Regions:
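Mature catalytic domains of secreted/periplasmic carbohydrate-active enzymes
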Residues: 1-207
Length: 207
């Protein structure tokens, strides 16, 4: 139990502290299957913008940092063994907004700030994506719920941010071939500001 609201120990450090030392995906999938599960959803990324697979588009991922394991890949392998359809959930589109509260802490750090530290060579902006003017009411963490569809004063995501999210999802689809995708969005990712990203992902997944 670490406090992550500080200028030194931030979310980036929590990612590194996660080791998953007792995680046994094959044992768990067998257990779920024996209990009657007929599909399984793995967490691909949460609002923290950290990818739980060997992602070439997001260096802050579970292979490079933390457990040093391909979490989605190991889930996928176990699911294949038990013929259990795999789903992957993607929650990262809103990291642009969710991490604004961290601009008070370490979310404005850059790659240069990591010199001599465990995260040397990694750019915190790849994780936090906070080099932008924050949304209206950003100091109140509850405001984001009224900005879910990118309205009500929400800061609009950059084209680079949207394309990076799209590339990450498409690469995950190509690498692990999930039978299902879940997006923690009202309709599709970036609905309300740019429908093309979600439609591109949808078309690629079906085709």
């Amino acid at each position: 139990r670490q406090c992550v609201a500080g200028t030194d120990y931030g979310y980036k450090d929590l990612c590194n502290a996660w080791k998953a030392e007792k995680w046994e995906p094959e044992y768990l999938i067998r257990l779920y299957y024996d209990m009657g599960a007929r599909y399984f959803f793995a967490m691909g990324q949460h609002h923290d913008n950290f990818d739980c697979w060997d992602s070439p588009y997001q260096p802050w991922n579970s292979v490079n940092i933390g457990p040093k394991r391909d979490v989605v890949g190991e889930w996928a392998k176990a699911c294949e063994k038990y013929d259990l359809p795999l789903g992957v959930s993607m929650h990262g589109s809103h990291a642009w907004l969710w991490f604004e509260i961290a601009q008070q802490y370490d979310a404005n750090m850059t790659k240069e700030d990591g010199k001599g530290k465990w995260w040397e060579g990694y750019d915190p902006q790849d994780l936090y994506a906070q080099r932008h003017t924050p949304s209206r009411g950003w100091e109140d963490a509850g405001t984001i719920h009224s900005q879910w569809t990118w309205g009500n004063g929400a800061s609009q995501p950059s084209e680079e941010y949207k394309m990076k999210f799209q590339n990450r999802v498409l690469q995950c689809v190509n690498a692990y071939h999930p039978a299902m995708l879940y997006f923690d969005d009202t309709v599709l990712p970036f609905y309300g500001c740019d429908e093309s990203v979600g439609l591109n992902i949808l078309a690629h997944s079906y085709n």
